[in-house]
Amino acid sequence: MPTTLAVVRLDRDLPLPSRAHDGDAGVDLYSAQDVELAPGQRALVPTGIAVAIPHGMVGLIHPRSGLAARVGLSIVNSPGTVDAGYRGEIKVSLINLDPAAPIAIRRGDRIAQLLVQRVELPELVEVTSFDEAGLADTTRGDGGHGSSGGHASL
């Protein structure tokens, strides 16, 4: 049985989210208002919809790759997270990454895409050390940001 996603259209004049092509992972989200973003400017843009993400799943708001490549429009907290318990309007925190040109977004423009994925919800267990918890050392250990190298400037 396929998973369904309940969608409330808060703005009846905007289309329901939809996939551009059969098999696409994400559904397009539309801007519910006109917005002009100056270079480097951010705006929280409403989409005119609310969704009920099923328990055990998460909604992830991703940039549209064409907009990112063509005009530098992206999402500040990419991907944005829509938790299963959230029932309010989906809003997208957009940013203009172009250093010189403003970006004009018109009501009804496709601005982002929503992916719904299963998510593990592990029980958190406090331990005093990973050794005590019986978890083996790894080759990475506590090597964090930049620890794997791989860039000429590092």
From Swiss-Prot:
* Keyword set, alphabetical order: Hydrolase, Magnesium, Metal-binding, Nucleotide metabolism
Q: In which pathway does it act?
A: Pyrimidine metabolism; dUMP biosynthesis; dUMP from dCTP (dUTP route): step 2/2
**Please, which domain of life does this record's source organism belong to?**
Bacteria
Q: Which reaction does it catalyse?
A: dUTP + H2O = dUMP + diphosphate + H(+)
Give me the residues that bind substrate, please.
R64, S65, G66, N77, T81, V82, D83, K91
List, alphabetically, the Gene3D superfamilies matched: 2.70.40.10
Q: Which cofactor does it need?
A: Mg(2+)
Question: What's a BP term from Gene Ontology annotated to this protein?
Answer: dUMP biosynthetic process
Here the segments flagged for biased composition (Gly residues) are: 144-154
Alphabetized InterPro entries for the sequence: dUTPase (IPR008181), dUTPase-like (IPR029054), dUTPase-like_sf (IPR036157), dUTPase_trimeric (IPR033704)
Record GO terms (molecular function) = dUTP diphosphatase activity; magnesium ion binding
> What is this enzyme's EC?
3.6.1.23
Where is the region Disordered? 135-154
HAMAP family (alphabetical): dUTPase_bact
Q: Which family does it belong to?
A: Belongs to the dUTPase family.
Tell me the NCBIfam families matching this sequence. dut, PRK00601.1
Additional notes on this entry: Each trimer binds three substrate molecules. The ligands are bound between subunits, and for each substrate molecule, residues from adjacent subunits contribute to the binding interactions.
Q: What does this protein do?
A: This enzyme is involved in nucleotide metabolism: it produces dUMP, the immediate precursor of thymidine nucleotides and it decreases the intracellular concentration of dUTP so that uracil cannot be incorporated into DNA.
Q: How does it assemble?
A: Homotrimer.
**Protein name stated in the entry:** Deoxyuridine 5'-triphosphate nucleotidohydrolase
Q: Which organism is it from?
A: Mycolicibacterium vanbaalenii (strain DSM 7251 / JCM 13017 / BCRC 16820 / KCTC 9966 / NRRL B-24157 / PYR-1)
Output the lineage of the source organism.
Bacteria, Bacillati, Actinomycetota, Actinomycetes, Mycobacteriales
